[in-house]
Amino acid sequence: MLPPAIHFYLLPLACILMKSCLAFKNDATEILYSHVVKPVPAHPSSNSTLNQARNGGRHFSNTGLDRNTRVQVGCRELRSTKYISDGQCTSISPLKELVCAGECLPLSVLPNWIGGGYGTKYWSRRSSQEWRCVNDKTRTQRIQLQCQDGSTRTYKITVVTACKCKRYTRQHNESSHNFESMSPAKPVQHHRERKRASKSSKHSMS
């Protein structure tokens, strides 16, 4: 048996030895993991990969296509300033109104239509439906005409205040065109039938 004094001196020595052993194990563990863990190679990540990870891949591109399909169409409004005349009477002040004879184009194309070719290429890919600019809103306006003899006249006229785009199908246009082209021929045929009927009645009477 060792005396108590020796135990008192051996206890700190044992603690020092245990700390050195733990430090040796920690150093070995750190060196071991430094060999196992490999540095991640710096690969340049493309924008398409990031978009697929964050936005669901192809779903993002489909939403872009859906936005392009919902194209709002606008009408180019032409403003007109003119005088109204009736014989020797002319309006005192000029009349300003809208003329709905412009072109119907997508709203995103309208600002860049003059001098830009994007609108022409885009609108050439339209479907079998055509858009026309027609009158949307009108109002009645009174105007005064000044005559050469000093008298004045008051007229009521209809003024266009807004235009809109109306969709027509090509089949509708072709059918109306065929109807208009065939309509003048009908009275001629009817006129010939009348001549033949009159001739036959004359022969029967003779």
Curated annotation (Swiss-Prot):
Matches recorded under PROSITE patterns: CTCK_2
Q: Which terms does the record give in the GO molecular function aspect?
A: BMP binding; BMP receptor activity
Enumerate the subcellular locations listed in this protein's record, separating them with semicolons.
Secreted
Gene Ontology cellular component annotations, sorted alphabetically: extracellular space
Keyword annotations of the record: Disulfide bond, Glycoprotein, Secreted, Signal, Wnt signaling pathway
Q: Which InterPro entries does the UniProt entry name for this protein?
A: Cys_knot_C, Cystine-knot_cytokine, Sclerostin/SOSTDC1
Q: List the biased-composition ranges (Basic residues).
A: 188-206
Q: Which residues are glycosylated?
A: 47, 173
Q: Please indicate if the UniProt record lists Secreted as a keyword.
A: yes
Disordered, as annotated region: 176-206
Give residue ranges for domain CTCK: 75-170
Its GO biological process annotations read:
canonical Wnt signaling pathway; epithelial cell fate commitment; hair follicle morphogenesis; mammary gland bud morphogenesis; negative regulation of BMP signaling pathway; negative regulation of canonical Wnt signaling pathway; negative regulation of cell fate commitment; negative regulation of determination of dorsal identity
Disulfide pattern: 75-133, 89-147, 100-163, 104-165
Q: Does the keyword Disulfide bond apply?
A: yes
Point out the signal peptide segment. Answer: 1-23
Organism's domain of life?
Answer: Eukaryota
Sequence similarity: Belongs to the sclerostin family.
Assembly and interaction partners: Interacts with BMP2, BMP4, BMP6 and BMP7 with high affinity.
Tell me, in a sentence or two, what this protein's role is: Directly antagonizes activity of BMP2, BMP4, BMP6 and BMP7 in a dose-dependent manner. Enhances Wnt signaling and inhibits TGF-beta signaling. May be involved in the onset of endometrial receptivity for implantation/sensitization for the decidual cell reaction.
Q: Please report the name of this protein according to its UniProt entry.
A: Sclerostin domain-containing protein 1
Q: Which organism is it from?
A: Pongo abelii (Sumatran orangutan)
